[in-house]
Amino acid sequence: MQDKYYELTITLDDQYVDLISDYIMNIHDEGLEFATGKIVMRSESDLTFVKDALVALQDELESDIHMDFNLEEKENIDWIKSYQESIQPIEAGKFYIFPSWYEPKEGYINIKIDPALAFGSGHHATTFSCLEAISKTVKAGDRVVDVGCGSGILGLAAKKLGATVELCDTDPLSVESCKENFKLNEAQYDELWEGSIDKAVGTYDVVIANIIADVLRFISRDLKAAVQEGGYLILSGILDKKEELVKASFQDLTLEKRTLKDEWVTLVYKKEKING
């Protein structure tokens, strides 16, 4: 890859964009980018000859088609490298979350995630706070379910702590992403299904749901039913302005911990044992 590339922007009446782009493609076969009244072309080759050809065409057509030209030489950025450098590993509780182009870190439980989005890679406040809560709540041998699992990072965290882990998501793409991330970490989930918590069988020591507030309220009955007596429910994805609405749906549980990070709230509830 060369250090520089050339960018030629042609501004013209939008009705002539197709005509001029066809002409350009006859003299230069690299791709074009279009906007209203604009044609943009980029190449590692000097595009002066294209500009000169269009100026000559414009002169030949006299004033029928008017074009303005802007030819710039720009730094050629390696976008993949630039993206990789922008994604930094993070430490959250006992966990070190890192992309595959970094090395694991000694002294932490390592989770490898190649993020497509910040959400689900540990960088988003809700995921970060859930990882901290999992660090303090989940223990080896626990039965855990991750509801709305997304990338699967929270279920992976519980698995690496020695728990039995089940995961579900209503989005089939999330289910596939979860499978890929478990494979990337050489881990094996115990159950994974497309759907929600209503398909779960039995109860769990820890139920994790990092979903938006309105959905948490909608499935609150199923979430609470899935927690065994003495177990925990970790809720996140809650904007602070909706916190009280969510709390109203879970007031029959004991609130053990509240975390506010940025504008996002994470709540850890305990389902008390019933005497007798």
From Swiss-Prot:
Residues reported to bind S-adenosyl-L-methionine: T127, G148, D169, N210
Gene Ontology biological-process entries: methylation
Enzyme class: transferase
Subcellular location: Cytoplasm
Protein's UniProt keywords contain S-adenosyl-L-methionine: yes
Any one annotated GO CC term: cytoplasm
Keywords associated with the record: Cytoplasm, Methyltransferase, S-adenosyl-L-methionine, Transferase
Alphabetical list of SUPFAM superfamilies matching this protein: S-adenosyl-L-methionine-dependent methyltransferases
A Pfam entry, by short name: PrmA
InterPro entries: Ribosomal_L11_MeTrfase_PrmA, Ribosomal_PrmA_MeTrfase, SAM-dependent_MTases_sf
MF-aspect GO terms: protein-lysine N-methyltransferase activity
EC number: 2.1.1.-
Main location: cytoplasm
PANTHER family tied to this protein: ELECTRON TRANSFER FLAVOPROTEIN BETA SUBUNIT LYSINE METHYLTRANSFERASE (PTHR43648:SF1)
Similarity comment: family membership: Belongs to the methyltransferase superfamily. PrmA family.
Physiological role: Methylates ribosomal protein L11.
Name listed for the protein in its UniProt record: Ribosomal protein L11 methyltransferase
Gene: prmA
